[in-house]
């Protein structure tokens, strides 16, 4: 399980160093193989250990290529999916087209989200967090049943 937000740097070749606390698990559970794709709702990237991505691919394969919405989701997620192999130094190369989608330059937020990571431009990440907090503070609507059961 991945959790927490960590600032990492992209080097001049577009590589990021995976934080040490995640490396061993990624090697043991995914042989250091990950898949990176775009988030179709936010200006960030999604980074999955290969076994987790294979579950997503199975779900995508069951969507209908005849349904325009389902086909669009397949095209966006699979068409941007790029395999990333963690090197001996624990670095991952993020493809240029993916970096461009998320506006990644030098400083990147690696955000744990249970079975995957999100990769955000640092400035965009903090703007998003502020927007989300503001939205929660001003929310007047009903909570979903699942959120009502969540006690923090």
Curated annotation (Swiss-Prot):
Pfam families: MraZ (PF02381)
InterPro entries given in the database record: MraZ (IPR003444), MraZ_C (IPR035644), MraZ_dom (IPR020603), MraZ_N (IPR035642), MraZ_sf (IPR038619), SpoVT-AbrB_dom (IPR007159), SpoVT-AbrB_sf (IPR037914)
GO molecular function: DNA-binding transcription factor activity; transcription cis-regulatory region binding
Subcellular location: Cytoplasm, Nucleoid
GO (cellular component) term, any one: cytoplasm
Family per record: Belongs to the MraZ family.
Subunit structure: Forms oligomers.
Protein name stated in the entry: Transcriptional regulator MraZ
Gene: mraZ
């Amino acid at each position: 399980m991945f959790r927490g937000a960590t600032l990492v740097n992209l080097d001049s070749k577009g590589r990021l160093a995976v934080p040490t606390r995640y490396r061993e698990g990624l090697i043991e559970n995914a042989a250091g193989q990950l898949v990176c794709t775009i988030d179709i709702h936010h200006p960030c990237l999604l980074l999955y250990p290969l076994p987790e991505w294979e579950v997503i691919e199975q779900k995508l394969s069951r969507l209908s290529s005849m349904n325009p919405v389902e086909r669009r989701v397949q095209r966006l997620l699979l068409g941007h999916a790029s395999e990333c192999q963690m090197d001996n130094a624990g670095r991952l190369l993020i493809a240029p087209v993916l970096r461009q989608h998320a506006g990644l330059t030098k400083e990147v937020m690696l955000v744990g989200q249970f079975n995957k990571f999100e990769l955000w431009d640092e400035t965009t990440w903090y703007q998003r967090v502020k927007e989300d907090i503001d939205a929660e503070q001003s929310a007047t609507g009903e909570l979903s049943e699942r959120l009502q059961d969540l006690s923090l």
